[in-house]
Amino acid sequence: QIWSLEKITSANEATTIPTTPTSAPASTPFKPLIEDGNYYIKTTLNPNFYLDVAFSSPADYAKIQLYSQWSKENKAQIWNIKHLGSNKYQIKSALSGKLLSFNTNHVSNNEPIFLLSEGNNNCSQVWQAEQVEGGFFFHTTCDETKALDVNGAYAYYGTQIQIWDKWSKTNKAQIWSLEKSLF
């Protein structure tokens, strides 16, 4: 499309202002919901419980659980969130550099979350963020009806993190708050 503007200087006079051809009008840059950086991710069921790598394991398939924060420097509870565009994010462990993931052969309720090395833009490693009152939903891009979830809506030491049907914008088992980490 080619656009031109006319400047009206009087009722009978118009001046055409040449413009550069463009395929689309300029738009405002997209601002992501979450700024890239390191965060603590907390359940809104109990703000004393954080997303945690079980036993601080750097291994593939390390279990992701809830645990209380025992040090601001604990890399097992620090997550690097990186915006990929359109409010899609990778969530990477500061401990190992591995990504929050799940088994894509079983995109179903109760599928546990674990760490896995980055691989081929796997949909299990890309999370769509949605801002809701009190925090964020993170649903998988493999199936937007499945969200990051606290098993049994029970915030306690070692509680499994899983995917589960997204069932309410007020379901605290699926709403996560973010706190910037300085580490």
Question: How would you describe each model-predicted region?
Answer:
Residues Q1-F183:
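Lectin-like carbohydrate-binding module/patch detector with strong preference for beta-trefoil
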